[in-house]
Every structure is written in C-alpha cells, then in structure tokens.
Amino acid sequence: MKIGIIGAMEPEVAHLIAAMTNASSQTIAGIEFIAGTLAGKDVVVTRSGIGKVAASIATTLLIEKYAPDAVINTGSAGGFVDSLSIGDIVISSEVRHHDVDVTAFGYEIGQMAQQPAAFIPAPYLVEAANKAIKQLGEVKAIEGLICTGDSFICDPVRTKTMLEHFPTMAACEMEGAAIAQVCHQFGMPFVVIRSLSDNANNDSPVDFDSYIVKAGYHSALMVMLLLEQLDPNSVK
C-alpha cells in the first residue's frame, strides 16, 4: 500500500517528513516529492504550494509519477463550527468548491461544469480517520463539509454569504476540492483532513500566523494515526 500525502505549506508537511524513514527526494516542475516510510506504510509526501492550481498540478504529478493507492490532503483550515476550537480537526464527509458559479447553466452553486457538486472521500479512509480520532486525546475531531476557494476568508460579509450557500460547512481552505477533483478524474480514493488555524473572521490573519504550526502538527498527527489504522487489504 502506497499513500500520497499533500500539504500546501511547510508547517503542514514538516512533521510528516521529519517522522519518515528511508526518505528519498525528487523535484518535478519545482515541486519536491519525498518518498519513504511513515507509520509502517509506503508514502510520498509533497508540499504543493497554496491554491487550487498549485494543488491540482501537485496531485496530478503525484498520481502519474508515483501511482499511490490513495491520496490524503492534510493542513490547516478556517473553522465554521462553534463546538470546535483552534487546533481541532475536520475530516471531510464531502468536499466542494465555494467560489465556483455556473448556475446559469443549471448547475448547483459550487459545482464546476461537468463535475459532481460534491466530491465524496473513500469510506475506508474516513473509517480509518474515525478510528484514529480515539487516540487524539484532548483534540476534537468531527466529520463535515469542507469547502475550497482561492481566497483566504476573513471577511464577515463573505462568510455570511458562504454559509447561506453551504449551511453545513464545517471548514474552508484553499486546496481540498481541487485535489478531490483531480482524484475524481483519476478514480483515486482520497480524504481531506484539516486542523483549524482560525475561525474565518476578522481575527483570522493574526490567528493563522499564530496557530499554523499548531494546526499543521495536529493535522499531521491525525494523518499518522490514520496510516496506522489502514489495512492494506482495505484498498478499493
């Protein structure tokens, strides 16, 4: 079993890379891919860069060059659930674009033309993540809708509009739906796991800078615990 792991920023992948053994590195199109062993599984970890285009490029290269059995997107997010605090975790129940609008042609808000409205993670990856939750100690984790767009959300007006469009949204970030869309195109199982670095409000820029390392660590810890739970025979 080989798992591809994608984070956008250095703090989101640093703990994973530090924990790897037998690591080797290759750079393709300016993106570094580090192959090795993590939590008893063969993995390839990459830092994609921020945003949907960067994430799409990295995901495509990862799948084409390394042929993983599944892809995990890890990192930080802005939170929309009152019961969660900074550092807590959202496991994707579904992933959607929040900044896509082709409703003039009969699509749902957030649905890209000729694509599903929501991208659904592989049940066996979500199941493994839920088993891993029990080992997180005081860190809370829930399943929920994660939305993606090419903007850092810190405007209450925009937050209000997003919640009107996606009332069940638990978190927002800048790469997950792009990664999910590429995985959908390739028939690749995926899951998105995000730790909250801020609450998508006026304080978000300050909170993000203060808590990105904490969020990156918690998300990385969740990924490692998930890997431990994965049964190689469960890939499907």
From Swiss-Prot:
This protein's GO CC annotations: cytosol
Residues forming the catalytic site: 12 (proton acceptor), 198 (proton donor)
Gene Ontology terms, MF aspect: adenosylhomocysteine nucleosidase activity; methylthioadenosine nucleosidase activity
Enzyme Commission code(s) on record: 3.2.2.9
Binding site for substrate: 78, 153, 174-175
Metabolic or biological pathway, per its Swiss-Prot or TrEMBL entry: Amino-acid biosynthesis; L-methionine biosynthesis via salvage pathway; S-methyl-5-thio-alpha-D-ribose 1-phosphate from S-methyl-5'-thioadenosine (hydrolase route): step 1/2
Pfam families listed in its UniProt record: PNP_UDP_1 (PF01048)
Keyword annotations from UniProtKB, A to Z: Amino-acid biosynthesis, Hydrolase, Methionine biosynthesis
Protein name: 5'-methylthioadenosine/S-adenosylhomocysteine nucleosidase
Species in which this protein is naturally found: Shewanella sp. (strain MR-7)
